[in-house]
Every structure is written in C-alpha cells, then in structure tokens.
Amino acid sequence: MVVVGYGVQKKSDVTGAMARVTSKVIEDRPVQNALQAMQGRVTGVDITSNNRPGELGDIRIRGNRSLTADNNPLYVIDGIPMSAGSIADVNPSDIESMEILKDASATAIYGSRGANGVILVTTKKGKTGRTTINYDGSFSFGFLDSTTDYMNSGQLLDYNRQSAITGGTYNGRYGDNPDPERDKALWLNPNNMSYMDKRLEKVYQQNADGTYSYDPSQLETTDWGELVTRTAFTHNHQISLSAGTETSKLYVSLGYLDQKVPMKDQDFKRYTANINGEIIPTKWLKVGMGLNATHSIKNYGIVSNTSNTGAKDSYGLAMGMMPWVPAYNEDGSILEVASADDQAYHNPLRNIDDARNETRYYGVNFSSYAELDFGQFWEPLKGVKWRTNLGAQYRNSRVGSYYGEGYTNPFKNPAMAPNVANNEHSQKLSWTLENLLYINKTIKDIHSVNITLLQSAERYRTEGLNMRGYEITFPSSLWYNIGASNNAKYAPGSNFSTWSRASYMARVNYGLMDKYLLTVTGRFDGASMLAAGNKWDFFPSAALAWRMEQEKWIQQINWINQLKLRVGYGVTGNSAVNPYQTAGSVTSTYASIPFGVGNVSSNTIGTKTNIMPNYSLGWEKTSSLNVGVDFGVLENRISGSVEYYIAKTSDLLMNQSIPVITGYAQILNNVGKTENRGFEVSLSTVNVKTKDFTWQTDWTFSLNNEKIKELAGGATYDSTGPWMVGEPLNSFYDFQYDRIWQNTQEDNHLMDVYRSLGLTFLPGQYKIVDQPLVEVPQGTEGSKTVEIKDAAGNKTGEVVSYMDNGFGKFDDNDKKIYNKSPKWTGGINNSFTYKNWNLSFFTYFRFGNTYYGLTQTIGRRIEKDTWSPTNTDAKFAQPTTATRETKYDYVRNYTKGNMVLIKNIALSYTVPQSWLKKCGASSAQVYAQVLNPFLFGGELVKAGINPDDLTGWDAGNHIGGQTNNTCITRSLVLGVRLGF
C-alpha cells in the first residue's frame, strides 16, 4: 500500500505520477533532514545540498513554474498540510515513508497548493506484536577538502611584480629583476603595519656589490583556511519504542543530533521527541494522535551574506586574506587588523571570537483523527466511513546576534560599530480541520468504486518583533539586555499577518475488472489572500490507467509481470500571494505642508500606499498532462517507470508597468505564462541473485525543459529576472567568454582593428565572443572602414574595410542565455549483499546548468595557472597593470556546473540471529560509511568548488552566482543499530 492524498491505495491501482522513498532508503544514508534522503533517488525532483548545519537544501519538482511566487512543494505530515512548521523539524529517523506526488492528476486533490508538487510524509507508528526497543547511533568525522591550487606568498609576490612589469609600471632599480623597495611599494600602503617589513627582509639578501639575491621561498605563508576550520564531528542518536495489540498501538522516540561542521564558528544541535498512538475502543471507532516536538540551536558566527558579492561565512572571509599576512602577533595574541591594502578587512580569527549568530527554534506538530466505521452499525453501510482530522503547528524562533569590538561592522555604520546586538523573535501558528467521508463499494467483483468527500478549513497567523542596540555596556549580556546599550537604539520593528483557506473536494476512484482504472477529482478552494470576487476557484483532474498485465493475451507472454499505461490531466493553483497584497501596503512618510505667514512649510507625518491595490488579483494556474508506463519483466528482475509530462502555467503574478498618472509605476497583476516539458525514467534491476549473493541497481534519470512563454505587456524581455520569452525561468543573459588572446599574426591584426575602434585588447587577456570580422573591398555596400592605429595611437596608413554586421559593438546580439537550472539530473545506487554483509555506493549527477563562480581570485588569493608567452594554454589571463579593456573580463566566471558526485559508500554487517539469542537482542547491525569521497566535473569542480552546495550561492534563483569558495566536506561515519 502507498499513501495518496487523503488515503491509501494499492500501488497497482495508482493512476497518477508519484514516487516513494521508504525508511530503508533513509536508514541507508546518514542524513540530517528529509530532503537529503530524496536527492537523486526520485525522478523529477532536483535537490541541491546546503552544507550549513541545520539548513535545508533547495528543492524543485519538475522545474520552476512561477516567476515571482513560491516554487516550493507542499509538505503534508501525517495528513496535515504544513503551514507554520518546517520539514527540517522532522527527524528523518521517525519517517516511515515519503510519497512524492508530481503530476496534476495526483496533486489536484490539494487544489491551490498543489501546483509545485506535494510531498506526503508518514511518520512511524506502533505495530502489533511484541514490544520492541530500537537504538540507532552514529559518529562521524569530516574535513573540508579544497582542491583549489592557490599561490603561496612568494608566488603571489612574483605575480604582482610580473603584473607591474607587463604593464610597464614596475620601474625597479635593477630592470625586471626583483627590487625590495619597489616590491614593498607594490604590497604596502603608507599606513601599513611593520610586520611585513620583517617578513620581506628574509626574502632579500644584499650582496657585496649592492645588488640583492632573491629567495621567495623564505616568505612565510599563512594558511588562513586551516586556521578557521577544524575536524568536523557529529554524533546522532535515536531511541524508539514500538508496541501494539489489536486495540491499541504506540510509538515513542527521542532523538539527539550534535553537529560540528569544519567551520569553527558553526554548529547545530537538535532535540526531537515523537509520539504516535492509536486506540480502537470499539469496532466502529478508531482514534489516533501524533505529537512531534523539536528544539534546535544553530550558530552561524558571522552575519550570513545572501547576496552574490562578499564572503558568506568565516571561511569566505579567511579566503579573502592575503597569504603573507600573519594571523598572530609575536606574543601569540591575535593580530588586530590583518590586511595591508584594505583596513576594512579584519582578522577573521577575531570575527570567530567576537561574533555570535544564534538561532533557536521551538516547534510542535500535532495531528489527530477520529474515524467512524458505519458498516459496523448497519450492514448496508459497509464500506462507509467518516473521518475527522485536526492538526496544529506551532513554531517559535529567536535570532540573537552579537558582534564585539574586534568584529568587522556588519551593519556598515562606522558611528555605531562596536558591540552591536540584535534580537529578533517570530512565532507562527496554524491549525487545520478536515472532515472526510469515504464510500468504498465493490459490485459483483467486477466494479470497484471509492468515493472521497472532503471539507477543510485552515487558519494561519504569524507575528514578529526585532530590535537592535549599539555599544552594549556588558558584552557578556549578548542580546539579552539591549535596553542597556549606551548608544541610540535602532528603531524596533514588528510585523503581523494572517490568512485562511477553505476547501471542498470530491474524488472518485473507479476500477473495472481490476484492469481499467479511472480517477476523477474536483476541488473548490477559497483563499483570503486574494481579491474579492477571485478568492474562490475550481481545480479539476482526471486520470486513466490500463493494467495490461491483467489481459489474457499479455499473460501469455511469460516474461512480462507488470505493464500499466497511465494518462492524467489536471489543473492546480498557486495562491502564494502575501496577505493584504491585493489592497496595497501602507507606510508612514513625511509630508511638507505650507501654512501661516509667508507660506512656511512644516514636516508632518502622514501615510502612503507602497503599491497600487489590485482588487482583481487571482490565482496562478498550472494545467498538466502526464503520460506514464509502469513495467516489470523477467520475474520483476527489471522494473521501473517512464514518464512524459507537459505543465503549462498561466496568470503568473508579475509587476506590470502602468501609467504614472495613476501615482504608481507598477501593479502586481496576473500576466505571463511558463511551460515545463520533461521526461523521466526510473529503473530497478536485480543483476545477480544467488543463494548468498545479490547485486541490485536502482537508476533515476530526469530531464526538464522549462520556458517562459509570455511576459507582462507582451514584452519579450524583462530585466527583473532577467526573463526572456522562449528561455528558462532562471537564467543569466550576458556576453560569452571565447578564449585568451594569443600573440599570433591573426590575433594581433584583430586586436589592431579593435584598438582603432577604441577597444584595447592585449595578448594574454580574455577574448569575448563578438560578431566576426568580415573584411571586404572598400566601397562594398553595407561596409565600414577604419584606419589602423599602432599602440601609441598613431595611424599606420593601413585601412581595413569590413561588413557592418555588428562587429566591435558588443551588444545584445553577442549575448547568450545561461541556464541556472540543470537540464537533467539522476542517481545510481548499487547494492551488493553477501550473506550478512552489504556494500553499497550511491552516485548523484547534474548536467546542463551554468554557474557564475569560476573566479581567478577567490577572495584575494589567486590561482596559479595564468597566461604567459610560455604558458599559452593557461586557464586565466596574464597579470598586467597595463591599460586595457576590462569591462568584459567578468564573463570568464561563467562555467558549466556539470558534476558527478559519489555521495556515499556504505558497508554494513548484520549480526546473525544465533549470536543475538545469547544476549537477548532481536537485531544488531554495525556500519561504516564514507560521505562525498569523490567529486568529478569540469572547470568548476577542478577549481575546488562544490556545485552541490548551496551555502555560497544565491539560493533564491535556485543556484547561480557565487563568490565564496564552497569546498566539499568529506566524512567517515561509524554507527550501530540495536533492537531488543
């Protein structure tokens, strides 16, 4: 049986597109949240990791649909849609299964919340039989592995000197040979500290003739990355009790996770408690209740930078430090300011000591139900049941941050820099009430009819408060006594919002001879967030399935065990509009009002609306067609499914330009369309099966092609995204890197033409894609001419005539679209079992997406592979201070994010039952795993950047831009599972 919306079904009777992740899959991978368990194991689901402790990754089911509204799926925990809670609060060890509903015929049952897919999470319940106690504990050790080949201090000194020599600005006393006085001028500013003088003295030794011998290896190098990182250590413990009889069941669990990642100032703790109970006091009544409580503490050290510029954490700050800068004074104390060329860069070790950024979460998810079986009262009502679900979610968070005197001012306010404290509180509460009527009938063993009727109501509210203080009197008070600050406090802020939903739904499942299946669903949804007259809408769906293996002519083919064709169509909605957005928000402002003698003006506080109200704002709608085949052959040694889908989203929520005479520039409106088309394959093969040995492989492959079909006002381009009709939703639209200019006759001629047009390019610098230079005889129609100039700007007498095809303009015709989202993703899991031993390894891959992150200088450290006359195949440009065209150099940072990651290699041993009887245990297993042992890919991976890590990227655009070096963390996990 598998879980579907508002019920369960036999897997063979499912007509929609769905996938399942079981507790066995979760156990096989030591994950901290549910998303990690799904990565690469489910077709159509693209998940990227987030190595920051306690944080979720990013998830998309069958691509992006909306430009401005939410693209995240709906989570349903034990039948209750999640609004106030978070999937991060659910301990993965408490999860029995996760069903992922992907097409509209499956998700339309959730109406306005199903457009982005639905993930049904079922937690573990008590089981009938003997009472069991289980323990699962693991310890892991990890380290940050960077493959970036950075320059050491001596190499960086040579790099800077060569840059000045190439640019003709070195002017040393010994020609191009090292000159200590000139080198100091390259590195030091007039206000610099003396420690660099002492370090440079070791590099230069004066000879008897007054010249200097030079040994750059004597220049000390500080490994800043080593100083701010540590050996990661995580321990995770879970103990559970399961008991049950025919009339009652109970499941109780306690969990504890303590995670210390390689960054010294980041850690995460989570405490969870879960209880699920069910009693059957009579034959006609069943009552159940579940309560999941969690408390978590996250510490992230410095302020998280969510932009695409600047460091994101202490490691990013450390990588911005020059390698020649010492971390400590001679007396062993931390160096106060450790940057020679920019006093704003403080020693990141001080930041670790003087910065706290702690978030505490308290969460409760409550679910309950009561079910009446009317068939126990009266035989004609057999198969008729009434069920009431009541659920509530509460989440309270407190974010406290404190930045001491040694920390780089996070709020960019020099007048209020020291001892800054910030305190933010928020709480979210939601409740859901559902009444369901089930009617299940079988007629003459031929017809089966299952009817589900639903009435649902949901309410949500959130409120928050924040305050900030400067020059905190007692640093030890952190953010707990902001009122005692010596300086004027930042104006406190608060917020509040609430919304409600109401729904009515009907679903009919019909089966004919257990071969022909039909599912029809209709849901009528209302949402308070939308405008009057548009609050309610109807979302229908239908799906057909043909179980061909039940046909006699198929049963004659012995090697076919399962063959089911499915087709489904449905409409879902997305009402992800902020409350009150249809009415326009109001803020305070100052108005200048003339009055009195001489028309004197006075500033008076008034109010104004920020955005023009839209009283017709409605739903985004997605219509989806899905065609699928489920199959199993050779005694199900080979089984799987193939899916093809088209999803079209209309009435997108976008800001539309309006006449300024209205008093506003834009209005949020339902305009625009997008489309997703895709192909998915999941395959499970039992490659070898003998008495003692089994080899099984599970494959997933997903291809998604998303496009914008229409923008506001019929425009073909909108710079907001940027968005372009016919292109993916999340894209870069920019110039293209071609190669590095070479010192060849062909390149020199082309550079001469550019120089004569006012564009100076030099050998060893980046060449950007341009329209080709097509030289033609002078006077040719449609041609232009240019007089060639030499490097000094003097005319050489040579005239070049070329076609006016856009050459030398560098405009939109030279740009291209870079897709941030992958074109295809997948995973391969191989499992080898020999007697009581099991060895498995899981591979995850993503291809076809582009990143903006391949920088030659990550922070201020510079990679070695730079162009020179003897290294013409280099990865990066030649260093030079010469005047040249540099405004296009950034385009070199675009690179493919293709990657193949071996996520884990696991070895386990299950202790034989004959051994366990002697100690009274029912089960025992020991295991060891290696996480992220191998990462393969293109330039991005070779540069030491992990494309699977969200930490340093712009997550809002589902990966894309990055300036922080996000290395990969490799770990060894040791664990044991015991059952009694």
Language-model segments: residues:
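A short beta-strand motif that forms part of the nucleic acid-binding face
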Residues: G114, K125, F139, G255-Y256, ...
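Extracellular/periplasmic, surface-exposed regions of secreted and cell-surface proteins
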Residues: I26-D28, G44, R52, S66, ...
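C-terminal beta-barrel architecture of Gram-negative outer-membrane proteins
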Residues: L839-L901
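Short, small/polar-rich motifs associated with maturation and membrane association
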Residues: M1-N274, K286-G288, N292-T294, N308, ...
